[in-house]
Amino acid sequence: MVKRSILLLIKVYQYFISPLTGPTCRFYPTCSQYAFEAVMIHGSLKGSCLAVRRILKCHPFHPGGYDPVP
């Protein structure tokens, strides 16, 4: 139940909020796609922790690049 709720929130962000901000993510896959995959693979708790860690790395002083879900 929690996992589905988190995945739904991520999809709402991807379809309705992200298009308004434009492409700003420094990574591939994007942070929202990374979060979706992390929750799908690792579950709601560990996936959310991985997603938060990734989002904290997404800033102008980080080079970005390819960073797949472990």
UniProtKB/Swiss-Prot annotation:
Its membrane topology: Peripheral membrane protein
Domain of life according to the entry: Bacteria
Alphabetical list of Pfam families matching this protein: YidD
Localization per record: Cell inner membrane
Protein keywords: Cell inner membrane, Cell membrane, Membrane
One of the record's GO cellular component terms: plasma membrane
Family assignment from sequence similarity: Belongs to the UPF0161 family.
Function per UniProt: Could be involved in insertion of integral membrane proteins into the membrane.
Name recorded for this polypeptide: Putative membrane protein insertion efficiency factor
Native source organism of the sequence: Desulforapulum autotrophicum (strain ATCC 43914 / DSM 3382 / VKM B-1955 / HRM2)
